[in-house]
Amino acid sequence: AAIFTALRERGLSPWLLDLGGGFPAEHQGNSSHPSAYGEAIAAALIDCFRVDQPRTLIEPGRGIVGDAGTVVSTVVEVVERGDGRWVFVDAGIFTGMVECLDEAIRYRLSTSAIGPTGPCILAGPTCDSADVLYRHDPVELPLSLRAGDTVRFHSAGAYTACYSTIGFNGFAPMSVRLVN
């Protein structure tokens, strides 16, 4: 509001406020409904601008497209190591899952395997040491999980396909399939 006031004092007539984006996808079941964001934005606009509110633009981004996509990966190998059970899948940091770096995004996971679960370190297929999706906070996956089973990353419709590298370490980029 202060910037709009300063611009008006200089003879300009700002009429549009772009609030940008950042509405979250439903990664862990703790996102608010979009109406909650709308209510908070409306209240802030009234508080800041009173009756002289500008037209407002928001860019909900992954809040719209995130839930529209699921990455379906295949288990390449399951290995017991000194630091725990490692599950290697064909979707990794370099094949679309770069937002798992530093475990920045925690995707909801489901698998084709069933039964009791246990902690595991989830890693991508390349030999690069950075190709580890979840290590510091291991994920719970079925103990029966084997090579050939699937692991699904839910709410992964935002950015994953465009982040996929082409031919890194000889791996093909992530394939995209549209489903009705």
Report each predicted region and the residues it spans.
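Active-site loop/helix belt of alpha/beta enzymes
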Residues: 1-78, 133, 169-171, 177
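Charged (often Lys/Glu-rich) extended helix/loop segments that serve as interaction or gating elements
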Residues: 51-180
